[in-house]
Amino acid sequence: MKIREIVRKYDRKRENLLQILHEIQDDNPQNYISKKNIELLSEEIGIPVSDIAGTASFYTMFSFKPRGKYIIRVCASPPCHIMGAETIFEVISRELQIEKSETTVDGLFTLEETSCLGVCAVAPAAMINDTVYGHLTGEKIKKILLQIKKKEGK
């Protein structure tokens, strides 16, 4: 979808900036907001580039660099940390051969840390794209990754 079409859905209002940014990022196969996207959005909505970039950079869910098809966000909140989030990171890193903030060579996965997913009752937790997984263990996350790889023919 073109930026102009996305903006039209939201009546060019500043209060809709977050929704617009989410749609722009979701529309990009590499799951990020490019500098060109921000410049075009600025022209379309009449908000300075610096305001748009500042807003997007404040939120961890937005990225300015290309990412994988599957974005794995591991919660690092205190409850998740206490319940084993670091182990989840280690297992994912080992299985995918990437570190935090990296993308696999094939462009399939990106591993990110997020401050809180708001699902403390099921710690440790992670979100892969829009799906939340709770009560994670090393074995459980391995199975989830394997299912995704099979789905993608890897």
Where do the model's predicted regions map?
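Signature of N-terminal electron-transfer/Fe-S-associated modules in redox systems
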Residues: 1-154
